[in-house]
């Protein structure tokens, strides 16, 4: 898992933050209210209604679960929810809450209607999760005082609050935890026009000169992810300041992204390495995940968690009962002729591999 996180941090088109410096940069560009939030129209519309209703009743917003791929704005929405409700936000993450006391300390310091944001909520330990259940339902927690035979349970009342949980792996949440969220929202990948709007907004905040075609060129290579779009914008801005008098046009963006090995559909060297291995070493597939990992010198987890999701989502890769298979789009992308349909049908005949 450490190697997977390391690779994700090193890729310019990775959807996870690459450093604490980048997190500071993200905060500077983060929209502060729902009206400024681009994309996710369905989720945004729902939150507008639920937040306004809660404010009219002077109640905390129902607990909110946000899930979807990294980099799509879950943390941003948590901050916006707190700001729209006019309350404080306390932020933590699942791995940080190692003991029940860690969570109890956070909960007992919340003021009325505050928002507690737990990122990576699927990584909460079972003992911490058990403490959370009564807090979510009854605004109470039970803590143990003392040790051994003298230990006793003390019930503490909490201020009403809203939990906003964020996860990239909703399937890893336990059913009891998932059932305690009154509002569940999935964030989807953005289209190029939405990302171009985000790029133009970010460029304005950075005092970068960009024309609509330059913003669209960056957007098309951003893998449907605002975090990647903003990261690419920073690098293209650097290139433009040195090579193009600070003017970001489509041609300048294309040259900058080519220098970074980000191709017109957002693939980098690792994406191309994986797809080319399937095409050339395994005749387009099917190939089992372990064989593929050995062929490209990467860990299985890295392929499944870092490389594959976008390739599958965009239709360049398929998981079949017999392994990974390159699609017609992949052959076209690399300028190759696809095998005839008769050969492809054989991929699905008998389950084998992983």
From Swiss-Prot:
CDD domains: AAA (cd00009). It comes from the Bacteria. Residues 191-261 are annotated as: Small ATPAse domain (RuvB-S). InterPro entries: AAA+_ATPase, AAA_lid_4, DNA_helicase_Holl-junc_RuvB, P-loop_NTPase, RuvB-like_N, RuvB_C, WH-like_DNA-bd_sf, WH_DNA-bd_sf. Residues 4-190 are annotated as: Large ATPase domain (RuvB-L). Its EC number is 3.6.4.-. It is an enzyme of class 3 (hydrolase). Pfam families: AAA_lid_4, RuvB_C, RuvB_N. Homohexamer. Forms an RuvA(8)-RuvB(12)-Holliday junction (HJ) complex. HJ DNA is sandwiched between 2 RuvA tetramers; dsDNA enters through RuvA and exits via RuvB. An RuvB hexamer assembles on each DNA strand where it exits the tetramer. Each RuvB hexamer is contacted by two RuvA subunits (via domain III) on 2 adjacent RuvB subunits; this complex drives branch migration. In the full resolvosome a probable DNA-RuvA(4)-RuvB(12)-RuvC(2) complex forms which resolves the HJ. The RuvA-RuvB-RuvC complex processes Holliday junction (HJ) DNA during genetic recombination and DNA repair, while the RuvA-RuvB complex plays an important role in the rescue of blocked DNA replication forks via replication fork reversal (RFR). RuvA specifically binds to HJ cruciform DNA, conferring on it an open structure. The RuvB hexamer acts as an ATP-dependent pump, pulling dsDNA into and through the RuvAB complex. RuvB forms 2 homohexamers on either side of HJ DNA bound by 1 or 2 RuvA tetramers; 4 subunits per hexamer contact DNA at a time. This is Holliday junction branch migration complex subunit RuvB. It comes from Burkholderia ambifaria (strain MC40-6).
């Amino acid at each position: 898992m450490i190697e997977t996180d390391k690779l994700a941090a090193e890729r310019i088109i990775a959807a996870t933050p690459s450093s604490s410096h980048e997190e500071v940069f993200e905060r500077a560009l983060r929209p502060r209210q729902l009206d400024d939030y681009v994309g996710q129209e369905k989720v945004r519309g729902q939150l507008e209604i639920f937040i306004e209703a809660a404010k009219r009743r002077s109640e905390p917003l129902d607990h909110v679960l946000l899930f979807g791929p990294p980099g799509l704005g879950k943390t941003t929405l948590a901050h916006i929810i707190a700001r729209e409700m006019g309350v404080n936000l306390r932020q933590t993450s699942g791995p940080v809450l190692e003991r029940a006391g860690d969570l109890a300390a956070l909960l007992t310091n919340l003021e009325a209607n505050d928002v507690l944001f737990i990122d990576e909520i699927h990584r909460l330990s079972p003992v911490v999760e058990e403490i959370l259940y009564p807090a979510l339902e009854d605004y109470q927690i039970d803590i143990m005082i003392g040790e051994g035979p003298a230990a006793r349970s003390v019930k503490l009342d909490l201020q009403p609050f809203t939990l906003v949980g964020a996860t990239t792996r909703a399937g890893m949440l336990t059913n009891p935890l998932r059932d305690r969220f009154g509002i569940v929202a999935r964030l989807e990948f953005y289209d190029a026009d939405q990302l171009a709007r985000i790029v133009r907004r970010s460029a304005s905040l950075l005092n970068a000169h960009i024309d609509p075609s330059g913003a669209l060129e960056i957007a098309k290579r951003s893998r449907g992810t605002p975090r990647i779009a903003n990261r690419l914008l920073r690098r293209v801005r650097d290139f433009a300041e040195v090579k193009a008098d600070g003017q970001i046009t489509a041609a300048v963006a294309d040259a900058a992204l080519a220098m970074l090995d980000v191709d017109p559909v957002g693939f980098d060297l690792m994406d191309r390495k994986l797809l080319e291995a399937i095409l050339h070493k395994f005749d387009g597939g099917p190939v089992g995940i372990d064989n593929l990992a050995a062929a490209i010198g990467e860990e299985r987890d890295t392929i499944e968690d870092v490389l594959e999701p976008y390739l599958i989502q965009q239709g360049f890769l398929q998981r079949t009962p017999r392994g990974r298979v390159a699609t017609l789009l992949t052959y076209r992308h690399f300028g190759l002729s696809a095998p005839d349909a008769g050969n492809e049908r054989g991929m699905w005949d008998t389950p084998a591999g992983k």
